[in-house]
Amino acid sequence: MNPEYRNKKIENKIRGLISEGLQKIKVPEIDALKSYIVISRVLVSKDKRFADVFVSYIGDADSRKRAVELLEKYKGFFRKYIAQNLRIYTTPELRFKEDIGIEESIRINKLLDEISKNNKNISDK
């Protein structure tokens, strides 16, 4: 099997298992935030020792930062959950990171809308 294809399969499986584990974890701190947390993508290193988990949060930047800190705090739970449900030689160490890609794309779309409105106003005059 192509190693790149295998890594993609592992990344998708880990992403799904973290999302699943997020729903199963019973921690009051996370319970309040988990309906707003989105695991947007996972990147596994070539040696499969590390997995960078990118987290988006539907809300403000401070809440997103808090969500990433909480996930980092409970990463042992998620790693154990992955180890129990994924047949792989070693379970990668999880590193949770903020994913600002969604917010950036929204910001860019707003800027493009403003530009098109300005161009329309100029052409109307």
Curated annotation (Swiss-Prot):
GO BP: any one term: maturation of SSU-rRNA
Cellular component terms per the entry's GO annotation: cytosol
Classification via InterPro entries: KH_dom-like_a/b, RbfA, RbfA_dom_sf, Ribosome-bd_factorA_CS
Residues of the signal peptide: none
SUPFAM superfamilies in the cross-refs: Ribosome-binding factor A, RbfA
Location (main, coarse): cytoplasm
Family: Belongs to the RbfA family.
Function summary: One of several proteins that assist in the late maturation steps of the functional core of the 30S ribosomal subunit. Associates with free 30S ribosomal subunits (but not with 30S subunits that are part of 70S ribosomes or polysomes). Required for efficient processing of 16S rRNA. May interact with the 5'-terminal helix region of 16S rRNA.
Subunit structure of this chain's protein: Monomer. Binds 30S ribosomal subunits, but not 50S ribosomal subunits or 70S ribosomes.
Protein's UniProt name: Ribosome-binding factor A
Protein's organism: Thermosipho melanesiensis (strain DSM 12029 / CIP 104789 / BI429)
